[in-house]
């Protein structure tokens, strides 16, 4: 034990640096957040001032998803914590390892103060894995345990409520404070059962989910697919785990209608890293046996797996691959199912400038292979179906929470994490209006992003549902703003287009910009309803 003393804020900075944290996001107040910003700066951790707290947590979460290190966000107490909730819910339901620091109120102050005071722990408790005050006898161990909880499957946020007095408190720190790591191995009985299912299946289908978003897992999945030669699908967040140009790739799995013609022919459905948080609100439609290979046993689940292998995915896949045999699928059938999926999701309105062409033309013009970030809304169907990717996290989306206001902050975070590739954000006008202010951070950091706004003057998905119930059109539309002017005011180069010719020319300009750019695309929403029905039923 060393006699050297450091503050708890300094200890936090040290531990974050050891875990690989390079940047954090937030909106500080006058308390512990200032101590954290100062302490982390001494360890080379950059602080980025977001414009909203929920965006800050989303940026931290996306950083975690891309880097593998915990994401870090901080807020002030009271309104800062309240504003952060949607971002914390994203980290929770989209399974991102995030540490959320909020300031707090000391017991002495709570005796007489009610201004901004509420139970912050209780507010965030439903969407956090753990809470800590770092007031125990060993705050270093307490913080290490919180970090481990955030980084243990299912990944998620932890809440550190830190008052100024605690942040500045001096402590003795051990020379080495490592926690033992648990090394899980697959249950042999379950491996044997899974092996029997694999060996006896003639027409298996693989469905890959968000837990599989790493290169080593993707490689192991590819090996299994090649052995089985079977149709393979991914959830939205797993897009890229199987490359779009892979001969066995069929398309997106949502739990809806579009994939049923393929999956209904399976005599074994193999779920790999598939967290049911990603599926739509419909009952499981398949009768085939289910083999669930996942980091954890998720409950409740849409299906009732016949066998489950729970633990590290690579080890589970290695344990069963030797029993995989060439299926009776023929390659032409798999190609047919992929073609059928594309036909179902093709935008049904013949207009040169439509959601599908907006996405496809953007990819043709993109010169640095940017990552795509996709907001919730009707445009996401075209964005996820027709933006082609080849690696995990090439496309970033909120699918557990499915929140709007995600694509722009996610693009900023992605560009900061990987400046060379940068990012392209596909967002509806409704979602963009929720987070447009983050373009100021993009301009401040000269983030390599291009934002494509689908400007249709409506909450199109809700508009579709309203019409389907034969209700009057109320509360779902607005006059179309000029988002190019908004972006210009926030420091970005921007254009507004309403023809495909102008869009093509503008894309070339946007991808040449050294910094953030935005294209406000006036688009006709007709066709979204038919496309949605084809996808979900």
Predicted regions and their residues:
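Phosphate/pyrophosphate-binding active-site segments
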Residues: 1-4, 134, 161-162, 173-175, ...
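N-terminal alpha/beta PP-like core and its mobile active-site loop of ThDP/TPP-dependent enzymes
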Residues: 2-325, 361, 365-368, 448-451, ...
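Active-site diphosphate/adenylate-binding microenvironment
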Residues: 9, 19-22, 27-40, 337-414, ...
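Active-site nucleophile and cofactor-binding loops and adjacent substrate-binding regions
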Residues: 27-29, 48-58, 73-80, 375-376, ...
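Hydrophobic "anchor" residues on beta-strands that sit immediately upstream
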Residues: 99, 371, 424-425
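Thiamine diphosphate
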Residues: 109-116, 301, 310, 381-537
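Active-site-proximal structural scaffolding
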Residues: 225, 262-263, 355, 435, ...
């Amino acid at each position: 034990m060393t006699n050297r003393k450091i503050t708890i804020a300094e200890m936090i900075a040290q531990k974050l640096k050891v875990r690989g944290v390079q940047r954090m996001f937030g909106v500080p107040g006058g308390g512990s957040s200032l101590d954290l910003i100062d302490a982390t700066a001494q360890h080379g951790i950059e602080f980025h001032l977001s414009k909203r707290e929920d965006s800050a947590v989303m940026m931290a979460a996306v950083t975690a998803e891309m880097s593998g290190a915990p994401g870090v966000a901080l807020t002030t107490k009271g309104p800062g914590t309240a504003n952060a909730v949607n971002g914390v819910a994203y980290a929770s339901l989209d399974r991102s390892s995030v540490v959320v620091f909020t300031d707090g109120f000391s017991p002495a102050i709570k005796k007489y103060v009610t201004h901004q005071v509420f139970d912050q722990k209780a507010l965030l408790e439903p969407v956090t894995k753990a809470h800590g005050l770092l007031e125990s006898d060993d705050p270093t161990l307490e913080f290490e345990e919180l970090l481990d909880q955030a980084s243990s499957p299912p990944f998620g946020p932890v809440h550190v409520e830190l008052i100024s007095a605690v942040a500045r408190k001096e402590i003795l720190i051990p020379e080495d404070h490592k926690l033992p790591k648990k090394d899980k191995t697959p249950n042999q009985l379950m491996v044997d059962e899974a092996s029997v299912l694999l060996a006896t299946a003639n027409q298996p289908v693989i469905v890959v989910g968000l837990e599989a978003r790493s290169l080593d897992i993707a490689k192991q999945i590819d090996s299994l697919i090649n052995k089985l030669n079977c149709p393979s699908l991914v959830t939205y967040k797993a897009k890229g785990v199987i490359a779009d140009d892979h001969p066995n790739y069929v398309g997106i799995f949502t739990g809806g209608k579009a994939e049923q013609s393929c999956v209904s022919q399976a005599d074994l459905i193999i779920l790999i890293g598939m967290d049911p948080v990603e599926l739509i609100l419909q009952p499981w439609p398949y009768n085939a046996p289910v083999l669930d290979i996942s980091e954890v046993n998720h409950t409740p689940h849409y299906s009732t797996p016949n066998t489950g292998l729970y633990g590290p995915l690579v080890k589970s896949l290695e344990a069963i691959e030797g029993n995989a045999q060439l299926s009776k699928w023929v390659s032409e059938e798999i190609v047919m199912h992929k073609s059928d999926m594309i036909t179902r999701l093709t935008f049904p309105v013949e207009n040169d400038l439509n959601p599908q062409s907006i996405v496809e033309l953007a990819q043709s013009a993109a010169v640095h292979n940017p990552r795509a970030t996709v907001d919730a809304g009707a445009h996401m169907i075209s964005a996820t179906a027709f933006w082609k990717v080849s690696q995990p996290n090439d496309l970033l989306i909120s699918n557990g929470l499915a929140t709007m206001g995600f694509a722009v902050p996610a693009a900023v975070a992605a560009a900061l994490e990987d400046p060379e590739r940068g990012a392209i954000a596909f967002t509806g006008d409704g979602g963009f209006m929720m987070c447009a202010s983050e373009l100021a951070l993009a301009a401040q950091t000269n983030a390599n992003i291009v934002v494509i706004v689908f400007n249709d003057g409506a909450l199109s998905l809700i508009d579709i549902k309203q019409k389907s119930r034969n209700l009057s059109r109320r509360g779902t539309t607005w006059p179309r703003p000029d988002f190019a002017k908004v972006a210009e005011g926030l420091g970005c180069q921007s254009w507004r287009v309403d023809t495909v010719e102008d869009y093509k020319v503008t894309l070339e300009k946007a991808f040449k910009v050294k910094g953030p750019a935005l294209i406000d695309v006036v688009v006709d929403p007709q066709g979204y309803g038919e496309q949605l029905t084809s996808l979900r039923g």
